[in-house]
Regions:
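Hydrophobic/aromatic-rich alpha-helical bundle segments in the mid-to-C-terminal region
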Residues: 116-121, 131, 135, 153-199, ...
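Hydrophobic alpha-helical connector segments
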Residues: 71, 85-114, 167-170, 193, ...
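N-terminal intrinsically disordered/low-complexity leader segments
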Residues: 1-21, 32, 208-219
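An amphipathic alpha-helix signature
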Residues: 27, 81, 99, 103, ...
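Short helix-capping/turn signature of helix-turn-helix
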Residues: 62, 121-126
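Short, basic, alpha-helical segments at the C-terminal edge of helix-turn-helix-like DNA-binding modules
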Residues: 74-79
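Helix-turn-helix
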Residues: 2, 22-25, 29, 33-67, ...
Length: 219
């Protein structure tokens, strides 16, 4: 396998931070198996077989099956947080930044749906320490979206009575895309991202706005 590993349904996930190649192959195999069968129904033998390796080879790189899930969850949440943080810290009005945050977050959950299903829906399989670490990342994800909504409310751009509840609704809407998105369906990840960005702007009472002008535009 190359650095750009292929997972279920033609999805491409780089996993460039996972080395050496054997560890990467095992992680990709674990993503596929967990997404297809669920964490508890998957054995280390299943994972090793998908990677074309022996069960003993798995333990050279990962002490337990849970360590694999923790690694997948950590990388996935780090990427999700980076996507939202980039949008939140970008140029533009709160509406423009919220649209970018939602659009990007949805595109990731659609385009990386196999990974996202494992990252988002296997939290309870982690042990207490690993779960606490991932929950802390989820609180940061929540804070990025909530911060944009708070700015929009403060500026009068958004009409939101319950910021906490609205933040939860926005994130739930985005995350659920990983559950139903089908690469053979009628919409691409970009199209679903644009649709959901528009829906969320309506949810917060904002008018749809054009993206911010590129930096250095002299107009």
């Amino acid at each position: 396998m190359s650095t750009a590993e292929e997972t279920t349904g033609g999805e491409i996930e780089p996993w460039e931070e996972v080395t050496p190649d054997a560890a990467r192959r095992l992680l990709v195999a674990a993503v596929e198996a967990f997404a297809e069968r669920g964490y508890h129904a998957t054995t280390t033998r299943d994972i090793a077989g998908r990677a074309g390796m022996s069960p003993a080879a798995l333990y050279i790189h990962y002490k337990t099956k849970e360590e694999l899930l923790h690694r997948i969850s950590r990388i996935g949440h780090d990427r999700a947080l980076a996507i939202l943080r980039t949008a939140a810290e970008g140029a533009g009005t709160p509406a423009q930044r919220l649209a970018e945050a939602v659009g990007s977050f949805v595109r990731w959950h659609a385009g990386r749906r196999t990974t996202a299903r494992v990252v988002q829906y296997e939290l309870e399989a982690l042990g207490p320490d690993a779960r606490a670490e991932i929950l802390a990342l989820r609180r940061q994800v929540d804070a990025e979206v909530r911060g944009i909504i708070e700015e929009g409310v403060a500026s009068g751009e958004f009409d939101v009575l319950d910021i906490h509840g609205t933040t939860l609704a926005v994130l739930s809407l985005c995350i659920d895309v990983a559950r139903w998105f089908n690469v053979d369906g009628p919409r691409t990840p970009d199209e679903v991202g644009a649709l959901y960005a528009d829906l969320v702007l309506r949810m917060v009472g904002a008018e749809k706005q054009p993206p911010p002008a590129p930096a250095g535009n002299g107009s």
